[in-house]
Amino acid sequence: MKDSYISIVIAYLMVTFILVSSMPIEGEKRELGPHRLPCPPKLNDENYCFNGKCVHLVAQDEPGKPYYSCICDEFYIGERCGTLDLTNPGYFLKGQSSTQSSI
């Protein structure tokens, strides 16, 4: 009984460590993963993503077929990052702190 309890605790700690270590640190820039490539310059020049960064996803089921996506800037959502996410409480908190500091 004691051994199974210890095994459960160890498993829980390992999962917690993995989850916490995979979370980005504030201000940290993540590298593109193995299935993401930079977008062609033409798409970046045409502002494919309104408020974000364009990435070319490599589809494993259809290699060679281009699929582009956006990694949105903070507080923006949508297919091309064109919508301000007003449901994010951080948007209002960030706005209040900048307003208060300018007074």
UniProtKB/Swiss-Prot annotation:
Domain of life: Eukaryota
Disulfide bond positions: C39-C54, C49-C70, C72-C81
Secretion signal, residue range per the UniProt entry: 1-30
Primary localization class, coarse: secreted
Keyword line: Disulfide bond, EGF-like domain, Neurotoxin, Secreted, Signal, Toxin
Keyword Ubl conjugation belongs to the record: no
Tissue distribution of the protein: Expressed by the venom gland.
Subcellular localization: Secreted
Transmembrane annotation, as ranges: none
Domain annotation EGF-like: ranges: 43-82
One MF term in the entry's GO annotations: toxin activity
GO cellular component, one term: extracellular region
Function: Ant peptide with probable defensive activity which acts as a potent agonist of the mammalian epidermal growth factor receptor (EGFR). Mimics, both structurally and functionally, vertebrate epidermal growth factor (EGF) peptide hormones. In vivo, intraplantar injection in mice causes long-lasting (several days) hypersensitivity of the injected paw to both mechanical and thermal stimuli. Its long-lasting effect is unusual for venom toxins whose effects are usually immediate.
Family membership noted in the UniProt record: Belongs to the EGF domain peptide family.
Name of the protein this chain belongs to: OMEGA-ectatommitoxin(02)-Rm1d
The organism of origin for this protein: Rhytidoponera metallica (Australian green-headed ant)
